[in-house]
Regions:
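A broadly conserved sequence feature marking short terminus-proximal activation segments
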Residues: 1-6, 28-52, 296-300
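Ferredoxin-type iron-sulfur electron-transfer modules in oxidoreductases and energy-metabolism complexes
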Residues: 3-21, 43-72, 76, 86-121, ...
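Iron-sulfur-cluster electron-transfer modules
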Residues: 25, 55-239, 246-250
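Short cysteine clusters
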Residues: 28-34, 38, 73-79, 83, ...
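A short, charged/proline- and glycine-enriched loop
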Residues: 155-160, 279-285
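Short, structured patches in soluble enzyme cores that scaffold and shape functional sites
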Residues: 164, 260-262, 289-291
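Cofactor-cradling patches in redox/metallo enzymes
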Residues: 167-256, 294-309, 318-405
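An alpha-beta-alpha
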Residues: 280-292, 298
């Protein structure tokens, strides 16, 4: 018979290492509500939050540090919504990931290291970034037929600093063009940075708060350099969460206000600053709510923002069920999409079956999601389950419906 080593002090150690220290997890009732709320508990093995919690409460430190659940959990926090004690299982998982000598599987740690070393997670050189903005600006001028249309750079005192997911520089430059076109149409006072323009922070996923703090500090310093009070995120769920929720905790102060580009688009539509023709988007559209943006950020009213936009730019919007804060995780969260061979695509696709069923039941032809990680996972799900849908983001539908005067 094997002997299991119990370390009662492990609970206190966990509490002290948490980003937001709490002893609430000591009051776990072992009621299994977390497991019944987890959409993936039966998707594959080592996916039960209740078992993880029991190991933690019993002080099974050695076992927990080897538990695949630590990396299998997508940190969607759906379990916390129904927990009678409101225990933050996701926060506990993140604490284990980053504070006990573990290294994130696949490319997750490399992404963080690259960000710390080069200033952005995809190692884009400054000259390449600036060249990209220059030719995107030329494309903008051609599209809007205005030689004075600009992508402002390092404009001090601008109302908004627009930051990106580096994928938009490397692979999705059209997204930068569309955002600039929307800002031009709305007559917005905005700028981009020549130095710190990456709004992402993958240390949210590896759990290492010292690394997250350094990345957050750089963005805070950039807003001070430019004299800007509000940072606007492109459609990236974890970038929004890491800035809106994470930065005040990592830095000990709220360094700047945070908005999603969706907030601005909603405002422009309400104020009549941009005009759209929804008949340009006449196929049925459904929305996947990203966990980081909709459930975890707890930003008041955030779940309604993408819906307000879609109902004005498409003719046939169909809800998934469940939706908003109760929506199912796509299965690619918590860094899973970049965990490589150590977190096999097969596992992500087992999780993705639930999302595939949700999409299929809507009968939609287009799936919209304001998150790059979700975008990747949904594209894989689309192929795996032969859904035959188009996966896109809000700005593309807004752009398609945009009426330029």
């Amino acid at each position: 018979m094997s002997v299991i080593r119990l370390e009662p002090d492990f609970r206190k150690e966990m509490q002290n290492k948490m980003l937001q220290p709490t002893d609430k997890f000591n009051y776990c009732l072992s009621c299994t509500t977390c497991a019944t709320s987890c959409p993936f508990v039966d998707a594959h093995s080592n996916m039960n939050p209740r078992i993880f919690m029991r190991k933690l409460i019993l002080g099974m430190k050695e076992d927990i540090l080897k538990d695949p659940f630590v990396w299998n959990c997508t940190n969607c926090t759906r379990c916390t919504m129904t927990c009678p004690q409101h225990i933050q299982v996701g926060a506990l998982v993140r604490t284990v990931r980053g504070n006990f000598g573990l290294t994130a599987p696949g490319y997750v740690q490399k992404i963080v290291d690259d960000h710390l070393r080069t200033g952005n997670q995809m190692e884009v050189k400054q000259e390449d970034y600036l060249d990209t903005l220059q030719w995107v600006e030329e494309e903008l001028q051609e599209e809007v037929k205005d030689k004075n249309a600009k992508i402002p750079l390092d404009k001090k005192g601008a109302k908004y600093l627009y930051v990106l997911n580096p994928r938009e520089v490397k692979y999705y430059t059209q997204d930068i063009l569309i955002a600039a076109k929307i800002f031009w149409a709305a007559g917005e006072d905005w700028t981009m940075s020549s130095k710190n323009w990456d709004g992402t922070n993958w240390a949210l996923f590896n759990g290492r708060d010292n690394e997250a703090r350094e990345i957050a500090k750089r963005m805070a310093e950039e807003t001070k350099r430019l004299g800007i009070k509000t940072v606007v995120m492109s459609e990236c769920g974890h970038a929004y969460l890491s800035n809106y929720w994470g930065s005040p905790l990592w830095l000990g102060e709220k360094p700047y206000e945070v908005k999603s580009i969706l907030h601005l688009i909603e405002q422009y539509l309400e104020e009549g600053r941009i005009k759209v023709d929804p008949s340009k988007n006449n196929q049925p559209v459904t929305l996947h709510d990203p966990c980081n943006l909709i459930r975890k950020s707890k930003c008041p009213g955030i779940a309604e923002v993408p819906r307000h936009i879609l109902k004005q730019v498409v003719t046939d919007f169909r809800e998934m069920w469940p939706n908003r804060e109760n929506n199912y995780c796509c299965g690619g969260g918590g860094g899973a999409v970049m965990m490589g061979s150590e977190y096999k695509k097969e596992v992500r696709m087992k999780k993705g079956k639930l999302k595939a069923d949700q999409i299929r039941e809507t009968g939609a032809k287009i799936v919209v999601t304001p998150c790059h990680n979700c975008l990747d996972q949904l594209n894989d799900i689309n192929k795996e389950y032969q859904l035959g849908v188009k996966i896109t983001q809000h700005i593309h539908l807004v752009d398609n419906a945009l009426v330029l005067s």
